Amino acid sequence: MAGQKIRIRLKSYDHEVIDSSARKIVDTVTRAGATVVGPVPLPTEKNVFCVIRSPHKYKDSRDHFEMRTHKRLIDIIDPTPKAVDSLMRLDLPADVNIEIKL
């Protein structure tokens, strides 16, 4: 796998969970003998929702809710077969979305 690069993108609503998952990926791949760049924090996506509190009138009374999506990027340069195998066996939390590109 010489000259290849694996790019891993992590997304989660909880920043502590995504940081621990990124740390676990970096530790696993480093132990397997591959070079790792990252985790690089990408900009946090913020969605704000405005909801009217009352079902009938009082339109001026509103609630604002927000949802933040935290993102991290990890690059694995020249991955070894052992690193790829250990990456596939890694157990991560369900609330972390993982995208892997070769």
Curated annotation (Swiss-Prot):
Key words, A-Z: Ribonucleoprotein, Ribosomal protein
Gene3D superfamilies: Ribosomal protein S10 domain
Molecular function as annotated in GO: structural constituent of ribosome; tRNA binding
Matching InterPro entries: Ribosomal_uS10, Ribosomal_uS10_CS, Ribosomal_uS10_dom, Ribosomal_uS10_dom_sf
One GO process term, biological-process aspect: translation
A Gene Ontology cellular-component term: ribonucleoprotein complex
Keyword flag Ribosomal protein: yes
Subunit description: Part of the 30S ribosomal subunit.
PANTHER family per record: 30S RIBOSOMAL PROTEIN S10 FAMILY MEMBER
Known role: Involved in the binding of tRNA to the ribosomes.
Family per similarity comment: Belongs to the universal ribosomal protein uS10 family.
Protein name: Small ribosomal subunit protein uS10
Gene name of the encoded protein: rpsJ
